[in-house]
Design a protein with these regions (language model features):
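Low-complexity, acidic/polar, glycine-enriched regions of mature
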Residues: 17-186
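Sec-dependent signal peptide recognition
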Residues: 1-7
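Hydrophobic h-region of N-terminal signal peptides that target proteins for export
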Residues: 8-17
Length: 186
């Protein structure tokens, strides 16, 4: 993201002086996940109910992200998997209807940034790191920072949060692939 942000700044001729607020475009964004299911994969999506995104293009470390996901709206590639995932042995959406992530640090990392933060699943909070890369959205002109796309990737071990149901057939690692389309708040 550092290289992408620097390229964006060089093409604009102006730098942002402080963190800029962005709103999520939920209809164009996806929080995707994947885990192993024997020789197959279970894939799915979860809707975002709230997002507070502040990006600082001069000082990346001043950027902050806070997101809330709706566990009750989760979908999976196998019909029974969504029901099992939301049930008491895995995410327990009746007791814990949301998953939250709040950044604690944003640091340059290769051609992107590492977003350090705390993720809360099933009422258990653990540290997590996501890798992020930022792009201008298709159809925007060079230097236009009003509409951006952020791709975040990472993984969590579901057992660390007590989501241990069907451990004999479903993998522990849940791989995340998040596409967040955002618009600057003026």
């Amino acid at each position: 993201m550092r290289a992408a942000i620097m390229a964006l700044l060089l093409t604009t001729g102006m730098a942002q002086a402080a963190p800029t607020s962005y709103s999520l475009q939920p209809e164009a964004s996806t929080v995707g996940f994947e885990t192993d299911f024997g020789p197959d994969k279970i894939t799915g999506r979860m809707p975002v109910t709230q997002a507070d995104l502040r990006l600082d293009f001069q000082q990346v470390s001043a950027s902050t992200i806070a997101v809330t996901l709706d566990v009750t709206g989760a979908q999976a590639s196998f019909p029974f998997a969504a029901q099992a995932m939301k049930g008491p042995k895995v995410l327990d959406s009746g007791e814990y209807p949301t998953i939250t992530f709040k950044s604690t640090a944003v640091k340059p990392d290769g051609d992107g940034v590492a977003v350090w933060g705390n993720i809360t699943i099933r009422g258990v909070t653990k540290p997590a790191v996501l890798h992020a890369v930022i792009y201008r959205q298709t159809g925007t002109v060079a230097g236009d920072l009003s509409h951006l796309t952020i791709r975040l990737t990472g993984s969590v071990a579901r057992s660390a949060f007590g989501a241990t149901g069907w451990a004999d057939s479903v993998g522990d690692e849940v791989r995340l692939d998040i596409i967040a389309r955002i618009a600057r708040v003026d």
